Amino acid sequence: MSRRSMLLAWALPSLLRLGAAQETEDPACCSPIVPRNEWKALASECAQHLSLPLRYVVVSHTAGSSCNTPASCQQQARNVQHYHMKTLGWCDVGYNFLIGEDGLVYEGRGWNFTGAHSGHLWNPMSIGISFMGNYMDRVPTPQAIRAAQGLLACGVAQGALRSNYVLKGHRDVQRTLSPGNQLYHLIQNWPHYRSP
């Protein structure tokens, strides 16, 4: 084998790994989103589509149990959906996306369907992202924060959110303690947050 061939044989795998690493760091590449079928969601009965790209994102918390493993987060997503559909009589889980402390995003209604997270005024013009857990006295894990921020970057890259979208806390648009004192304080430092 010539010296040139040996050099290529050594360098090519490194260059391929470098290209793959750059590809995964592209903001158009979403944080992992757990699809509905993977967390065993009930079938949605929703039909009202959102008009994309959206100007607003509303961040809330479920105010219930937190989860930190894929298995516990899938169960928690099912619990939230069951409450929304079977107890409240909604067509699906109210949120467009749920964030677990396992660092994963769980698809709720997704980018295309109107949520039931912030009232009749805000639902048709916003995406609702809810952190699974209660964040009155603590912040979500760094993994959960990164997952949410990655989801927002993905929404912009895919054209679901405007590049100048405005982030709101649930309490900014409704009378509620959501997203909890600590999470609310945290999101106020995110670049797209705007006070009421």
From Swiss-Prot:
All copies of domain N-acetylmuramoyl-L-alanine amidase, residue ranges: 53-180
InterPro entries: Amidase/PGRP_sf, Amidase_domain, Peptidoglycan_recognition, PGRP, PGRP_domain_met/bac
Gene: PGLYRP1
The keyword Cytoplasm is assigned to this record: no
GO molecular function: Hsp70 protein binding; molecular adaptor activity; N-acetylmuramoyl-L-alanine amidase activity; peptidoglycan binding; peptidoglycan immune receptor activity; receptor ligand activity; zinc ion binding
Residues found modified as Pyrrolidone carboxylic acid: Q22
Top-rank lineage group of the source organism: Eukaryota
Signal peptide feature range: 1-21
Assembly description: Homodimer; disulfide-linked. Interacts with HSPA1A; this interaction forms a cytotoxic complex that is released by lymphokine-activated killer cells. Interacts with HSPBP1; this interaction blocks the cytotoxic activity of the PGLYRP1-HSPA1A complex. Interacts with TNFRSF1A; this interaction is important for cell death induction. Interacts with S100A4; this complex acts as a chemoattractant that promotes lymphocyte movement. Interacts with TREM1.
Maturation and modification: N-glycosylated. N-glycosylation is required for bactericidal activity.
Keyword Glycoprotein listed: yes
Protein name: Peptidoglycan recognition protein 1
Glycosylation site list: N112
Tissue: Highly expressed in bone marrow. Weak expression found in kidney, liver, small intestine, spleen, thymus, peripheral leukocyte, lung, fetal spleen and neutrophils.
Disulfide bonds: C30-C154, C46-C91, C67-C73
UniProt keywords, alphabetically: Antibiotic, Antimicrobial, Disulfide bond, Glycoprotein, Immunity, Innate immunity, Pyrrolidone carboxylic acid, Secreted, Signal
Subcellular location, principal: secreted
Family per record: Belongs to the N-acetylmuramoyl-L-alanine amidase 2 family.
GO biological process: antimicrobial humoral immune response mediated by antimicrobial peptide; biological process involved in interaction with host; defense response to bacterium; defense response to Gram-positive bacterium; detection of bacterium; immune response; innate immune response; killing of cells of another organism
Record-linked PANTHER family: PEPTIDOGLYCAN RECOGNITION PROTEIN, PEPTIDOGLYCAN RECOGNITION PROTEIN 1
A GO cellular component annotation in the UniProt record: extracellular exosome
Subcellular location: Secreted; Cytoplasmic granule
Primary role: Innate immunity protein that plays several important functions in antimicrobial and antitumor defense systems. Acts as a pattern receptor that binds to murein peptidoglycans (PGN) of Gram-positive bacteria and thus provides bactericidal activity. Forms an equimolar complex with heat shock protein HSPA1A and induces programmed cell death through apoptosis and necroptosis in tumor cell lines by activating the TNFR1 receptor on the target cell membrane. In addition, acts in complex with the Ca(2+)-binding protein S100A4 as a chemoattractant able to induce lymphocyte movement.
